[in-house]
Amino acid sequence: MHTAEILETLASGGVLPPETAHMAFDRLMSGEMTPAQAGSFLMGLRSHGETPELVASAVRAALAHARLIQGLEYDRIDIVGTGGDGRNSFNCSTAAALTLAGMGYKVVKHGNRAVSSTSGSADVVEGLGLPLETAPEDVPVLLARHNFVFLFAPFYHPAFRHVMPVRRDLGIRTLFNVLGPLLNPARPTRMLLGVAKPAMLHTMADALLLTGVRRAAVVHGAGGYDELTTMGPARVVMVRDGATEEMEINPADHGFAPCTPAQLEVHDRQEALEVMRLLLAGEGPAPMLDMMAFNAGLAVYLMEDSMPISAAMARARQAVAGGAGGKVLDA
């Protein structure tokens, strides 16, 4: 099918079959579309709506152009959010990921520099002295040694150079705003994925099912965050055994005290880094430590098929208090 026919289908409100969507995304990633075609395609997708099938087609096409990591035959997890929650909170996903690695779990953290937040995961990781651009063949060695590796999105997805100028010129939200968390080149078998909009909970969960993740939780935190917070109960869609199930996780059930948005904020990159160093040592503001443990606890639950969530939360609280994340930096 010619690109013009694909654009006509979208313009007339038609639905792209998965194989056609994959073909179109492949052309976009390979630079075969002109800037005008690429912009029209992204606008058409926005009008079409982000279905799980469309998201999964985009993921498969993007990964086909990525620098994939081979040789990982064990369970591994990513803790990541879509961003876009408009909160200048500390980088909880990175703190929880490093804590998990300090507990002995294999963590493949895929991320980028800040877009809508004060400090992105790449900014924090770089500030902590960890490498950003790790060659794919070196990842298994680093994972075996440290249980943690950071995968810098621009390095692993060179094909995105064809998409970024168009996204920048459009200046509006597109499908690519939610794709990032699903494009981990290490293809994690487990995932804790946060979404800023509750309407995306089931879309992302169903997309994870279609892309083969074994066990995952898609969460929307109280207060409108793309991660768990201790402000109140979180909406969660679990992905396991080939199906999805919506549930609620209440921080009060696990002994976490409520907090306010102001208690989770950082105001610039320097503060974000200073706070991160404290948290990884088991020090710093109690509300941030609690949020760290809450997210790490759910991640432990995802990694342990037979552990009750209460036990997973207790283990994570103990690890956070003991500075497990900081030990990864010292290894």
Swiss-Prot record:
Enzyme nomenclature, EC number = 2.4.2.18
Q: Which reaction does it catalyse?
A: N-(5-phospho-beta-D-ribosyl)anthranilate + diphosphate = 5-phospho-alpha-D-ribose 1-diphosphate + anthranilate
Residues the entry annotates as binding anthranilate 1: 81, 112
Which biological pathway?
Answer: Amino-acid biosynthesis; L-tryptophan biosynthesis; L-tryptophan from chorismate: step 2/5
Q: Please provide, in alphabetical order, the Gene Ontology terms of the cellular component aspect for this entry.
A: cytosol
Asked whether the UniProt record includes ATP-binding among its keywords, one would answer: no
Q: Which GO terms describe its biological process?
A: L-tryptophan biosynthetic process
| Family of the protein in this entry | Belongs to the anthranilate phosphoribosyltransferase family.
Q: Where does 5-phospho-alpha-D-ribose 1-diphosphate bind?
A: 81, 84-85, 89, 91-94, 109-117, 121
Gene assigned in the entry: trpD
Q: Which domain of life is it from?
A: Bacteria
Q: Which InterPro entries match?
A: Anthranilate_Pribosyl_Tfrase, Glycosyl_Trfase_fam3, Glycosyl_Trfase_fam3_N_dom, Glycosyl_Trfase_fam3_N_dom_sf, Nuc_phospho_transferase
Q: Where does Mg(2+) 2 bind?
A: 226-227
Q: What is this protein called?
A: Anthranilate phosphoribosyltransferase
